[in-house]
Amino acid sequence: MAGVGSAVRRLYLSVYNWAVFFGWAQVLYYAVTTLLESGHEAVYAAVERPLQFAQTAAFLEILHGLVGLVRSPVSATLPQIGSRLFLTWGILWSFPETHSHILVTSLVISWSITEIIRYSFFGMKEAFGFAPSWLLWLRYSTFMVLYPTGISSEVGLIYIALPYMKASEKYCLRMPNKWNFSFDFFYASILSLAIYVPGSPHMFTYMLAQRKKALAKAKAA
């Protein structure tokens, strides 16, 4: 029974990783072709649906960690996926005024290259039991460029959206109300920007440690 359970787990994770891989491949293809043909102003409209699918599907990774399907710590997975879902739905989908900015292009290209590498790496490991050394190197090295460009784009887009949040009062809950609770999306977004200050260096340091560990293990093997 344990063998059957392991096979089902590997099949599920393989299908999951490759499905999301193809989602991100779509995002990158549409982003690059639209950028070259129509300019950065048209990129978001071209990638919106596959971007929403691929990024929202990542929510399952939190559940995978919680139920023990994967060994990735939820403490590392949750903030990264949470921030990306916030950008995907709370910023880009909620505030169309951001769509024509060049940072949308740098964001989706940074995200998509990162995730194409990551999901193909884990997809190969689940499907075949191994990943080639060059893919391992890409998995644990490209973040040194793509993480800063992605984070800078995230921070920039949140900042750009702030005036539109304040003017529209979207997602705000004012008192009095039956819950006796108030919420202001504008100030919550400012708080999220403040969290990036310690959070981004912490995540980058964590990924550097993971890189050192993974490449040393591969070299020893």
UniProtKB/Swiss-Prot annotation:
The active site is at Y147, E154. Residues 1-11, 71-76, 122-141, 210-221 are cytoplasmic. It holds the Pfam family PTPLA. It is an enzyme of class 4 (lyase). Residues 33-51, 96-100, 166-184 are lumenal. It is a multi-pass membrane protein. GO terms for molecular function: 3-hydroxyacyl-CoA dehydratase activity; very-long-chain (3R)-3-hydroxyacyl-CoA dehydratase activity. GO terms for biological process: fatty acid elongation; sphingolipid biosynthetic process; very long-chain fatty acid biosynthetic process. GO terms for cellular component: endoplasmic reticulum membrane. It is found in: Endoplasmic reticulum membrane. Its EC number is 4.2.1.134. Keywords: Developmental protein, Endoplasmic reticulum, Fatty acid biosynthesis, Fatty acid metabolism, Lipid biosynthesis, Lipid metabolism, Lyase, Membrane, Transmembrane, Transmembrane helix. The chain crosses the membrane at residues 12-32, 52-70, 77-95, 101-121, 142-165, 185-209. InterPro entries: Tyr_Pase-like_PTPLA. It catalyses: a very-long-chain (3R)-3-hydroxyacyl-CoA = a very-long-chain (2E)-enoyl-CoA + H2O. Pathway: Lipid metabolism; fatty acid biosynthesis. Catalyzes the third of the four reactions of the long-chain fatty acids elongation cycle. This endoplasmic reticulum-bound enzymatic process, allows the addition of two carbons to the chain of long- and very long-chain fatty acids/VLCFAs per cycle. This enzyme catalyzes the dehydration of the 3-hydroxyacyl-CoA intermediate into trans-2,3-enoyl-CoA, within each cycle of fatty acid elongation. Thereby, it participates in the production of VLCFAs of different chain lengths that are involved in multiple biological processes as precursors of membrane lipids and lipid mediators. Belongs to the very long-chain fatty acids dehydratase HACD family. This is Very-long-chain (3R)-3-hydroxyacyl-CoA dehydratase PASTICCINO 2A. It comes from Oryza sativa subsp. japonica (Rice).
